[in-house]
A protein has these predicted regions:
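Membrane-interface helix/loop caps of multi-pass membrane proteins
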Residues: 1-233
């Protein structure tokens, strides 16, 4: 609809979905072709918020000649957002999924890794263990976790922590692990650069297929066709 197009173009799609109490994982009628832009909306909202948080903390840290205010400030906001995510996911799971307040901690986890990583020193064996653990968790959550578990909440810790493990384990080039070298392959790097674009493009194609075939259960062949079309576009 025009209404949803305007909200998605203004990077407010997630707020519209909250207002409508949309269930992201609902099974039945095809979703809106603009629904997937909730993720881009939250990203833009976070990037608008981040300078407002980091700027004053950096100013104070520079004045004090210490990174403690920056570390402490980001950690506090991270903790508040995580607790909010736990509570909102438990009581209002549908709206919590799209709520930027409960998603901020996921982004700030990356900020905390960037802040603390210069002080993290690992030997190669420890780095290898952490990298394999990170990749194992990342694959496991996509296969083993029930689709009816509420998200984000504590469940979001698994992909966030696994990503942090992989980044931390590859911090020092001379101690790069097998996982780090594999993920540095130029084809995987290229795929990673395209991944979010594919993620956004596949959704309207998926919705079109669901409307065309009058079902939300498209099967493997049509599903792979959607992925290929998403890559080509």
């Amino acid at each position: 609809t025009i209404h949803e197009f305007i909200f998605s173009a203004g990077h407010l799609e997630n707020l519209l979905l909250i207002r409508r109490e949309v269930d992201y994982l609902q099974i039945g009628d095809p979703a809106s072709p603009f629904q997937q832009y909730w993720a881009l909306s939250i990203q833009v909202q976070f990037y608008a918020f981040l300078p407002l948080l980091i700027g004053p903390l950096l100013y104070i840290s520079n004045k004090m000649k210490s990174l403690i205010p920056l570390m402490l400030g980001v950690s506090i906001v991270f903790f508040i957002s995580f607790v909010y995510s736990l509570v909102s996911t438990h009581f209002t799971p549908n709206t919590a999924y799209f709520n930027p307040l409960g998603r901020v901690w996921e982004f700030l986890a990356g900020a905390l890794v960037a802040i603390f990583i210069p002080y993290i020193k690992l030997n190669k064996k420890t780095a290898s263990i952490i990298s394999f653990l990170g990749i194992f968790i990342l694959f496991s959550i996509g296969i083993a976790f029930p689709s009816d578990w509420n998200f984000p909440g504590y469940v979001a810790l698994f992909p966030v922590v696994s990503a942090a493990f992989i980044i931390i384990s590859g911090n020092e080039s001379e101690k790069r692990t097998l996982v780090n070298r594999l993920l540095s392959n130029r084809y995987l790097v290229m795929l990673g650069a395209m991944s979010f674009t594919i993620y956004l493009w596949h959704w309207p194609i998926l919705v079109f297929f669901q409307h065309y075939y009058e079902t939300t259960n498209l099967g493997v062949v049509k599903g792979m066709t959607i992925v290929v079309l998403g890559v080509l576009l």
